[in-house]
Swiss-Prot record:
Swiss-Prot/TrEMBL cofactor(s): pyruvate
Site residues, Cleavage (non-hydrolytic): 111-112
GO BP terms, alphabetized: spermidine biosynthetic process
Residue numbers annotated as active site: 112 (schiff-base intermediate with substrate), 117 (proton acceptor), 140 (proton donor)
Organism: Yersinia pestis
HAMAP family on file: AdoMetDC_2
Entry similarity comment: Belongs to the prokaryotic AdoMetDC family. Type 2 subfamily.
Residues bearing PTM Pyruvic acid (Ser): 112
Protein name per its UniProtKB record: S-adenosylmethionine decarboxylase proenzyme
Gene Ontology molecular functions: adenosylmethionine decarboxylase activity
Gene3D superfamilies recorded: S-adenosylmethionine decarboxylase
Any Gene Ontology CC annotation: cytosol
Amino acid sequence: MSKLKLHGFNNLTKSLSFCIYDICYAKTADDRDGYIAYIDEQYNANRLTEILSETCSIIGANILNIARQDYDPQGASVTILVSEEPVDPRDVDTSEHPGPLPSAVVAHLDKSHICVHTYPESHPEAGLCTFRADIEVSTCGVISPLKALNYLIHQLESDIVTMDYRVRGFTRDINGVKHFIDHKINSIQNFMSDDMKSLYHMMDVNVYQENIFHTKMMLKDFDLKHYLFNAKPEELSAEEKEQITRLLYKEMQEIYYGRNVPEV
């Protein structure tokens, strides 16, 4: 897409929101409480602030304000307001490719925000526990928040990720013509690195005419030892391992597809 000569500021709003899920099996009520306490501490407001602040540093944004809160009994929220440094729109790369990791600081944001909320929870009886982090990066201007995607997924490695990217509003060129998007995109996947894509099953549901893009990700490899809390596979019988594996797989399928799967 050729560079547009705009009349005034770029008024497009670009929002990337995604949920990351960590799934775990904790056999007893005490184990489930222990997992919730553990994951709540791992992703407390201070840790989330560090992650989001590093994100701002990577994409070259100025932090204007930070609001953070840990909740009782669990959960945390962090919101960071940011603004961009001066940037020449002609120097902005809007092509589809993975965004930067900490070693590559290349992007800038404008009058924007980054926020995260966490939601630990557990099944009342089945031993299943899930942790969800809900993250949104919203920008106004020439830069796409998709540049932050690759780093955040690397930082918050998860079993399942669901992402939505949307461009809202319009901007006007010097001839008065409205433009409802200012860059080419056919999939969020084009902004992820190859090594990341190789780890996940991925599926797109896009509404191109509305500038709405949706991608789901679920880990390909399943190793039971990574999903047990306070337990090891060798401590379980073959029957227990099969039952737990079935429970975890069903849980992950339901989250990935966004619907309950009936018992067979």
